[in-house]
């Protein structure tokens, strides 16, 4: 089933709604952005600071590793440290292998978390699997916590894979190995969800994911999951990689699914550059959703790519400067003004498309190209208002942007 979205003709896949702390996931709720820390959870201050960085960048949920007793003991202290920093973002505990033990022995950890993530592929093997899975579900029920059942092709339950392979071998036309793997992922997720409900977890407390690192496989898996269940779905290309490769791969996969209305929360699993900001994955997730018209997080800065008419570096510097300025100002603007995230700002490099593109934005500036008159007309809501000249064009244009925000958007009460 599907529901209409406010974004053009896009139709959202109809799912249940799951509450995670103060955040709603699924049904008609906006697609939620989430992220994950890469700190040692035992480092309370370091983890809290990175969670705060991710939350301030716009992450609406942040996942942290809980892999041993020291990490489990640290979780409540991380929560307290965040509240002292005035950061109230829901924390998701990431459990593998020993989650049943850690949660049983450290109930304060379970209480401090807003959601539990468990992997059916490593919750336990053989006769231990079901009791250990049941133990985590029981803890989730007692603490009223939702659960993401997260299947991953790198840790797929071997018993499920073997069963699906046996079934495939009996078909008149057996499927290829990739199709078998995809089916095993879907079966593992759905059977685990059914078992969680059997153990007492409400259907409105379950989110599913089934991650792979191939774009085409991810699209196929989630199409299948969406067709076979109404649980909210967490999208993400696992191990997407670094830099532009990771961004392009994640965007290629998620954009297709989101356009089909599939996906209720997303995470971009980028490998950060050495000494790079972990928050880049949050920015990329926001930009995917905003570019597709699904969410609005920050004013959009439109800029042309430049050509032989724009040989001056000033155009590039101004476009970059305005992009950074808008993003830096957004935390303040968001607190003060309603709707400012919908603003568009155009920074264009020459007379060919500059004036026309600038007129379509809320605010636009058309810089002179090579050989053009050294003047930069500014357009506000489609009307030319002023022409800037000289060495202070960037500073003057930022002041115009500030004035537009202050005069066009409604100031919030209080």
Curated annotation (Swiss-Prot):
Iron-sulfur: present as a keyword of the record? yes
What does this protein's UniProt record list under function? Converts 2C-methyl-D-erythritol 2,4-cyclodiphosphate (ME-2,4cPP) into 1-hydroxy-2-methyl-2-(E)-butenyl 4-diphosphate.
UniProt pathway: Isoprenoid biosynthesis; isopentenyl diphosphate biosynthesis via DXP pathway; isopentenyl diphosphate from 1-deoxy-D-xylulose 5-phosphate: step 5/6
* One GO-annotated biological process of the protein: terpenoid biosynthetic process
Q: How is the cofactor bound?
A: Binds 1 [4Fe-4S] cluster.
EC assignment: the record states: 1.17.7.3
HAMAP family in the cross-refs: IspG
Query: What's its catalytic activity?
Result: (2E)-4-hydroxy-3-methylbut-2-enyl diphosphate + oxidized [flavodoxin] + H2O + 2 H(+) = 2-C-methyl-D-erythritol 2,4-cyclic diphosphate + reduced [flavodoxin]
Binding of [4Fe-4S] cluster occurs at 304, 307, 350, 357
Q: Does the keyword Glycosyltransferase apply?
A: no
Enumerate the PANTHER family for this protein: 4-HYDROXY-3-METHYLBUT-2-EN-1-YL DIPHOSPHATE SYNTHASE, 4-HYDROXY-3-METHYLBUT-2-EN-1-YL DIPHOSPHATE SYNTHASE (FERREDOXIN), CHLOROPLASTIC
What is this protein called in UniProt? 4-hydroxy-3-methylbut-2-en-1-yl diphosphate synthase (flavodoxin)
Family assignment? Belongs to the IspG family.
- Keywords for this protein: 4Fe-4S, Iron, Iron-sulfur, Isoprene biosynthesis, Metal-binding, Oxidoreductase
Show the GO MF annotations: 4 iron, 4 sulfur cluster binding; 4-hydroxy-3-methylbut-2-en-1-yl diphosphate synthase activity (ferredoxin); 4-hydroxy-3-methylbut-2-enyl-diphosphate synthase activity (flavodoxin); iron ion binding
Q: Which cofactor does it need?
A: [4Fe-4S] cluster
The membrane spanning regions, by residue number, are: none
Which NCBIfam families does the entry mention?
ispG_gcpE (TIGR00612), PRK00366.1 (NF001540)
